[in-house]
């Protein structure tokens, strides 16, 4: 029998582990995702008073079987109007609720309950026929998904001044795949177009050398080896709302680690508009090309334009006398001097993502960073 871990942590460290097989050829790389995310969560509790510490230790020791039900607190929905006795449905924000699974309704450490989920659709949890909420819950109570997990490494404890710190790591035992398309696409690729993304670029270069290879038949062959250091960067995400945190989580599952590429703007002023355009659709725009040494070098580059909350991805089909032609019209109203960024086709350069969820006065703050690598096309 699984036992609920009912204690709200101060921080949650979440690790998502994917596994991608990558094969390199002279024309590019081929990637195969070998499994969905393995979800690992480390709960950190800073406890005072001592009575709560005693409850934590007793709860852990009494679970001899080691099977746990772990609430996913960072995807909890606040019930602004509470919940009533005998209700059979609960309206929640999008999260990993599963038909046949369970959800936790939580008002406080002495008032909570688990409910079974018959169906979950359009943000509504429906309880099985004959089931209902067993008591009233006040406004400000929380509802969150619950997943089965094990704790293979035990409970860690540290004693400080007027405080006891606990940590334990849950390994979720059910498969997790929350993939969804939350971004607009261009050329079949998701475009990261929100303003909570920061990228840092490291310039690449070309290295050439000649190797003498012994072919095993008594002679040496001259082999030319050419290595191109692809564009690399680091992306950092900080999500302050439930909606953006959920969209980010789905984005990671959609990418499946290193498997799926996406478009990432540099968010630099790579090009500056040389005229006002819009609001009517347009497919040509003048740019300030004074600092472009070789205009032909930008042909084929993907670009990103964002002005006043509107944004679009496109590419440069041609350039002539400072006027770039786009393959299809865009409708963004832009002004002289507005920046246009280049956009790189990248993939994550890791199969392991480390996310931090910190509890705040008004919810949860989530953040993580990951390296990205340009995908050769």
Which ranges hold each PLM region?
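Small/polar beta-strand repeat architecture
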Residues: 1-20, 95-96, 109-217, 222, ...
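Short secondary-structure "cap/edge" segments that initiate or terminate local elements
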Residues: 13-52, 171, 197-249
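Small/flexible residues
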Residues: 25, 159, 165, 234, ...
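Intrinsic-disorder/low-complexity, polar/charged segments enriched in Ser/Thr/Lys/Arg/Asp/Glu/Gln
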Residues: 40-44, 87-89, 163-167, 230-234, ...
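Autoprocessing Asn-cyclization modules and mimics
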Residues: 48-133, 187-189, 194-198, 242-333, ...
């Amino acid at each position: 029998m699984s036992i609920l871990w009912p204690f709200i942590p101060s921080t949650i460290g979440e690790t998502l582990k994917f596994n991608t097989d990558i094969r390199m050829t002279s024309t590019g790389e081929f990637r195969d995702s070998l499994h969905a995310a393995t979800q690992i969560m480390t709960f950190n509790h800073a406890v005072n008073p001592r009575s709560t510490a005693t409850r934590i230790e007793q709860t852990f020791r009494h679970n001899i079987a080691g099977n746990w039900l772990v609430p996913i607190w960072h995807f909890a929905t606040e019930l602004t109007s509470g919940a009533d006795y005998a209700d059979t449905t609960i309206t929640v924000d999008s999260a990993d609720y599963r038909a046949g699974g369970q959800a936790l309704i939580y008002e406080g450490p002495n008032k909570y309950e688990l409910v079974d989920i018959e169906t979950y659709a359009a943000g509504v949890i429906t309880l099985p026929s004959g089931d209902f909420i067993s008591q009233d819950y006040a406004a400000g109570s929380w509802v969150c998904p619950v997943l089965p997990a094990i704790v293979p490494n035990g409970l860690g404890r540290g004693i400080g001044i007027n405080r006891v710190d606990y940590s334990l790591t849950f390994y979720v035992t059910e498969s997790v795949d929350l993939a969804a398309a939350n971004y607009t696409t261009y050329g079949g690729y998701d475009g990261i177009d929100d303003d909570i993304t920061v990228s840092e670029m490291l310039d690449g270069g070309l290295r050439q050398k000649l190797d003498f290879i012994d072919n095993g038949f008594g002679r040496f062959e001259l082999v030319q080896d050419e290595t191109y250091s692809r564009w690399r960067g680091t992306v950092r995400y900080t999500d302050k709302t439930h909606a953006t945190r959920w969209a980010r989580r789905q984005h990671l599952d959609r990418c499946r680690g290193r498997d799926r590429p996406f478009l990432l703007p540099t968010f630099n002023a790579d090009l500056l508009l040389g005229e006002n355009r819009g609001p009517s659709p347009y497919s040509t725009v003048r740019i300030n090309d004074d600092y472009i040494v070789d205009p032909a070098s930008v042909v084929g580059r993907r670009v990103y334009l964002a002005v006043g909350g509107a944004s679009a991805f496109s590419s440069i089909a041609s350039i002539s006398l400072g006027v770039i032609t786009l393959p299809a019209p865009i409708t963004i109203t832009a002004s002289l001097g507005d920046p246009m960024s280049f956009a790189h086709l990248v993939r994550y350069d890791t199969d392991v993502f480390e996310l931090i969820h910190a509890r705040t006065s008004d919810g949860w703050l989530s953040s993580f960073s990951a390296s990205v690598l340009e995908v050769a096309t």
